[in-house]
């Protein structure tokens, strides 16, 4: 029986809000093994997304039941060909911002990925499976996480990244009280300072 189930692992200790992506591609050992790294709006692999709020540890999503809400590229979810494919699930985590103007907004918090969800630490993904799409049960678990590529030391925050100064480039991070008060969430400006050659 054909089904697509995506599970939130019990190890997740918080409510999950965000965009779930279901990614498919032809098996190809010459490409990146992670399907999410093949996503591109130019010539990348097909992917399909639907937003969820309030997912909890242990929840299981029946993707076929969500078919009417799924948006896809470059074709519709129901047009995925029934044949041998590689599949993967990816979850873009959203943070909840309760702004001072009374509005509630959800969005991906940048942890140094530069706005690129494929590189943003703490987003979740599953193993890649090779399946006979349309003819078998597919089960994926979001049990992998994009790791922070450095140790977060005392006093550091992930927002705007944490870059090591170079001889002629200095990195500055400034906490904005005005933006933090508005978003009800700590907000920072980041800046790069290029020093002239032979600067002492």
Language-model features, listed with the residues they occupy:
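Contiguous segments within soluble domain cores/interaction surfaces
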Residues: 21-52, 56-58
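N-terminal cap/lid segment of alpha/beta-hydrolase-fold proteins
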Residues: 11, 135-200
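Short Trp-Ser/Thr-centered turn/loop motifs at beta-strand boundaries
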Residues: 107, 114-148
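Short amphipathic, basic-aromatic surface patches that mediate peripheral association
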Residues: 4-13, 26-35, 178-179, 195-199
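Contiguous beta-strand segments within globular domains
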Residues: 1-8, 12-21, 190-191
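A beta-strand/beta-hairpin structural motif
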Residues: 52-78
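Short acidic/polar inter-strand loop motif in beta-rich domains
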Residues: 29-31, 91-112
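A short tyrosine-centered beta-strand micro-motif
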Residues: 78-94
């Amino acid at each position: 029986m054909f089904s697509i189930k995506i599970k939130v692992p019990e190890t997740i200790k918080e409510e999950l809000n965000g965009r779930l992506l279901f990614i498919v591609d032809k098996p190809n050992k010459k490409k990146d093994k992670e399907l999410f790294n093949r996503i591109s709006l130019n010539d990348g692999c097909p992917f399909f997304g639907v937003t969820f709020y309030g997912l909890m540890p242990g929840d299981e999503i029946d993707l076929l039941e969500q078919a009417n809400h799924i948006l896809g590229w470059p074709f519709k979810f129901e047009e995925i060909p029934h044949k041998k494919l590689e599949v993967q699930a990816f979850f873009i985590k959203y943070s909840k911002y309760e702004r001072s103007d009374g509005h509630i907004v959800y969005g991906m918090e940048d942890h140094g990925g530069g706005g690129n969800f494929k590189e943003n630490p703490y987003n979740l993904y599953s193993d890649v499976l090779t399946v006979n799409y349309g003819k078998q049960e597919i089960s994926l678990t979001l049990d992998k996480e994009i790791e922070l590529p450095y140790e977060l030391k005392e006093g550091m925050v992930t927002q705007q990244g944490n870059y090591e100064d170079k001889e002629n480039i200095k990195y500055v991070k400034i906490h904005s009280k005005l933006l933090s008060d508005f978003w009800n969430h700590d907000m920072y400006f980041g800046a790069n300072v290029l020093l002239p050659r032979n600067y002492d």
